Amino acid sequence: MITFKRVLLLCTLSAACGGAFAQKVASGVVLDAETKEPLIGAVVCTSNGQKVVSDLNGEFNISVNPGERLSVSYVGYENKQLPIADTQQRTVVKLNRGLTLQEVNVVASIASARNKKAVGADVAHLDAAKLLAKGQAANLSDLLDGRVSGMQMFQSNGKVGMPIRFNMRSGATLSMDRDPIIYIDGVRYNNSHTSDINTSQDALSALNDLPMDDIASIDVIKGPAAAASYGAEAANGVIVITTKRQSGSTLERGKLAATAKISVGWSNKAREYTQFVNNTDINNFFVTGHNVSAYASFTKNFTPGNQLFFSFNESHNGGIVPGNKDVRHSLRAAYDMKQGPFTLNFTVGYVNGDISIPQTAQGRNDAIWNLMRDQKPWGYVSERTWRAMKWKYDNDRLTAALRMAYVLPYDIKLETQLGLDLNHIDGLYTLPYGYLLGTNDEGEKSISNRRNQNLTWDWKASRRFDLGHKLHLTGTLLSQIVQRRETMDKTSASIFPADVDNIAAAAQRSVLETSFEQRTWGLYGEAFLNYDNRLFVNAGLRRDASNLIGRNVASIYYPSLSVAYNMEKAKLRAAYGESGRLPYPTDAFTYYEVKGMSGYGPLLVPGKKGNDNIRPERMREIEAGLDWTPARHQIGLTAYAQFTTDAIIYTPL
């Protein structure tokens, strides 16, 4: 009996030891398949339900039994199954991003870009490179309209090169415009329209200066709550455009990659006008428009972290209105370098455009007005005169951005960026001698010269603090200087001698000169709290000072707060923020007009009375929303309320 018990005990111990030795430890690291960055908080579980979470370096260790499988998951990424045989040694698990609401990084504030799941406000992201790989867009309106909820974009009329109008969630009042501010690669972009020689409805659009094929992604920050970190000009929202920095996928060392694309298209009027009346004049007036575009890009990877990108684009667009043409040539280069704790990014782009804009918004003297009135284009203006008149712009634009970053001891990150946007536009309008317009058949000519300059200089410092096992805090402080300058001089002349169009020979001449400068300085502080990679809280405060506000107003403060909580396939979010709209350049100052001459000099009267106490319009917004991703679809719901104070109202003197 004793022998039997000993044998039974020995068998039991052997079985236990065998089970213990059969169980092994699987170790590895979880990485983003595209960026190779470690994924913190990825869930690794076995078939029997045992779970661990990857650490700050994306690493994990878990006990497994023979025959089990490992499942690795992370919010915003596709799940991956691994046989135990693949995990006997240290394994690198690369997860691909899935089609979920958290799949991309977006601009969370002026100071940071984060995974979308960490953003508590309504920010839309558009992968422009993927869309343009499947088709062609003539302008920003074609690319964005209908793809971003809560925003509509359209051209002011059907001609090529025309201004793009925005109808998006904003806080603008009746006195101010509704256009958002635009950043391209961190540079404040001058998106004002030019109408120096023509009407505002037929102005030259600045947004056409960016080749569509150079755009990598677009983030649309909607409403004052989301855009509060941008301060006194962001009540209409912000559009952040990031351009391409490489051709195709990631390159190996020493490799060269190239892409080329040619697009050809045609456009016609929406429909033939044949109902009820004979509209031959309308149908024959319009022509077939065309679009021809050629694009090429090259990328050279010299060493890891040392890469050069170059692109060229040429486009020829013709509208359906006779004489409407837009020809543009653009060059762009980008250089990226990373050596240890130092990072450098440089981007430079140049665009030259020649555009012809026949007028269709000047009342009785244009063909379209007469078409709408009498179904005939030549009611008050002859076809000979209309086709002889010319409105042309020669446009040159240079944009450049230099960014440098360095990681100090204790993981303190310093970053500075200098951006420049220079725009030179020459305008020319001619009515040749011998062509009757109204009562003038002796010629008319206007020339304009415009210089626009935007300078942006940012400094930023940030550091991450680990407050506990699952709690992390990132503090950021940013200083931003924005300077805008615009100067324009215009000379108009009429009544020329026969076949002479030199302005000096005209009997009547007039000169106009305008200029303005805006200087804005903003200081922004931000605290970002991350708990368990699911709950995110962001609090920020911005202080702005500008030469456009009244002399009795020292500065303006704009607070913001947002919260996001993530579940497996949904995100709850809420945000509150304040932002503003700066007054127009002359709102804070009184200026005078000449109303005649006297023996003592010109007679001056107030043309506009400024307000020493004027401050930016302030928009307060609170929003709450739900983002849900069922069965590889995306559903977003947002409710918001806005409140406006300090509204700017204009009254007669």
Predicted regions and their residues:
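Surface-exposed loop/turn segments flanking beta-strands in extracellular/periplasmic regions
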Residues: 273-281, 362-384, 428-445, 485-513, ...
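Short acidic/polar hinge/loop motifs at secondary-structure boundaries
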Residues: 61-63, 187-222
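Short, acidic, small-residue-rich periplasmic hinge/interaction motif at the N-terminus
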Residues: 31-34, 42-45, 73-77, 88-132, ...
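N-terminal periplasmic "start-of-domain" segments of outer-membrane beta-barrel proteins
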Residues: 45, 49-52, 57-59, 107-134, ...
